[in-house]
Amino acid sequence: MTTLQTPTTPPPALIQLRAVHGGSADTAMIESWAGGAGWSLGRGDLALFTRHHPDGLLIGMLDDRPVSAMMIACHHDEICFISAPIVNPAYTGRRIQAATAAMGLSYLADRTVAVEAPPHMREFFAARGFYTCWRSITFAGPVPAPRTADPHVLPMDTDLLHQVAGLDTSCFPTDRTAMAIDWAREPGRQALGYVKNDRLVGYGVIRPGFGAARIGPLYATEPHIAAAIFDALAERAGRRGARSIAVDIPEPNPAARALCETRGLSHDTETLRMLRPGVRAGERAPDLTLLYGLTSRELG
């Protein structure tokens, strides 16, 4: 659960942040901003997020007007994952975005913080102690034609959901099992696992988006396992009427890129995974050989 601390040095500009709760009119407003602002939101993401992080969805106010939004997810006081702020499209320029990010960071004191930063914010975060870990690329395109189904790919029932911790904690710097399970079983989503010798060796989730259907996460111990899950998820999305799909991949995993390209997806946009080490250094590095699709840009 996200617990924010008292701000340290006030950031520039008079941006004030307040928490937004799931299902509110503010949530709908943020969703309407997100499509053209670089977030990879799926339907239901914000409601699920606020259940696990009640104070983590923040809206930026300037002279009592909503101008920006960001997400802060703190896990066990070990690491916080923040979203790059988005700005109300009625406002222009990057100063509001930077001021919102600065205000959000002021609540996190000396914690370890990770972010998927848009390229134009690289210098902003670098000046605040962040370094670049890798580039993340969004691949998008039409739903590919169905392929032969792999019998090892199965719906994620309760027993399989209880096995997600091993894969998720290998691909994320700390444990977030409860949220990972809820993410997979949220209504309207399809979660599929690859089972080998009664063991979960890969799983993925596809959810409706505000445009393309979005795959994420996608974890697998081998490339052919990732491909089988991807194909099954895409087939189900097409059956539900989706015309396009998107997935955010880590560039250092060439097998993830190859999978997207062989399925007809192309490079759409990109971000930079950046990290600021906290006083409790020693955070676990994700195993990128297992990571074929981020959960989302906002959550890592």
Specify the residue positions occupied by each region the protein language model found.
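Active-site/acyl-donor-binding loops of N-acyltransferases
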Residues: 2-4, 116-117, 128-147, 243-300
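Amide-forming acyltransferase catalytic core, primarily the GNAT-like/NAT-type
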Residues: 28-32, 130-214
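Conserved acetyl-CoA-binding loop-helix of GNAT-fold acetyltransferases
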Residues: 87, 93-106, 223-236
